[in-house]
Regions:
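Active-site-adjacent beta->alpha loops and helix N-cap segments on the catalytic face
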Residues: 25, 47-60, 75-84, 101-122, ...
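Hydrophobic faces of well-ordered beta-strands that scaffold small-molecule active sites
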Residues: 12-19, 38-43, 66-70, 97-99, ...
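Active-site mouth loops of central-metabolism enzymes
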Residues: 11-25, 44-47, 67-81, 127-141
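Glycine-rich phosphate-binding active-site loops on the catalytic face of alpha/beta enzymes
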Residues: 96-103, 151-167, 213-230, 235-237
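C-terminal alpha-helical cap/extension of soluble enzyme domains
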Residues: 1, 183-251
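Catalytic cores of alpha/beta
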Residues: 29, 81-88, 137-151, 199-212
């Protein structure tokens, strides 16, 4: 760290990191470098099920909320193993759980019941939106679903984007559905949302649109520090929007 102080400090905003299978030693390196900027770690989709050293990995991540991917919940639900899943989460010492319906056909009322049920024992992150890039829903539906899941007990609602930013709040080309996001934000407090933003372009857009304290998800481990610089205005993409003064030169 430099000997001088720019007066730049992180002021809120969750950074939700996606893990695709890093080992314990890799996570030790990640935490040593960027642990101060990581708020939640998601073990993507069903990777936890096939990770042989999962307990060791969770020990390294101790102190960080860890959640298993929502797709794994969908598999468990489809096989009627919800009670076994709850027990396993408890045995692993996990306090957070993600519930989604991005792939399976889960009736709306049933999803709300499950959120309410899991919220008795866990901190629930629910996810809204389909993983099917061709599935498009009207903004009012997103708003209705998000509000319903928050009322059912979800701590935060994740807006689907996939790890590649090609579904949900994104078009298949990767372009942001800005009108959809704006309408959601008009009706729902953005503090209750986690926007999936796996690319630098999407991260910068959210920081400029909603400020440095916006909650962002599906952040790759190697992108945690770059995202932090976007939040603090230490990167050209957000320098003018974040730092005081509107006429700062950008080189």
């Amino acid at each position: 760290m430099p000997a001088f102080d720019l007066g730049l400090n992180r002021d809120g905003g969750l950074t939700h990191v996606i893990d695709k299978g890093l080992g314990p030693r890799a996570w030790e390196d990640v935490l040593e470098t960027s642990g101060d900027y990581i708020d939640i770690v998601k073990l993507g989709w069903g990777t936890a099920y096939v990770t042989p050293n999962l307990e060791r990995k969770l020990e390294v991540l101790k102190g960080k909320p860890v959640v298993l991917g929502g797709t794994f919940f969908e598999v468990v639900h489809s096989q009627g193993k919800l009670e076994e899943y709850k027990r396993w989460l408890g045995e692993l010492g996990l306090t957070h759980v993600e519930l989604s319906d991005g792939v399976i056909d889960l009736p709306r009322e049933r999803k709300l019941e499950l959120i309410e049920d899991f919220a008795r024992d866990f901190i629930v992150l629910s996810e809204v939106g389909s993983k099917d890039a061709e599935a498009v829903f009207a903004p009012y539906q997103w708003v209705e679903w998000i509000k319903g899941e928050l009322e059912a007990g979800a701590w935060k609602v994740i807006t689907e984007g996939r790890e590649g930013g090609t579904a949900g709040i994104y078009r298949p080309t990767g372009e942001m559905r800005t009108g959809l996001v704006d309408e959601i934000a008009h009706e729902v407090d953005v503090a209750d949302l986690i926007f999936e933003a796996p690319s630098k372009g999407s991260q910068a857009w959210f920081v400029k649109q909603f400020g440095p304290a916006v909650n962002l998800g599906n952040i790759p481990p190697e992108e945690v520090i770059p995202l932090e610089t976007l939040r603090l205005g230490l990167r050209a993409d957000t320098l003018k929007e974040v730092l005081p003064g509107e006429d700062l030169p950008v080189s």
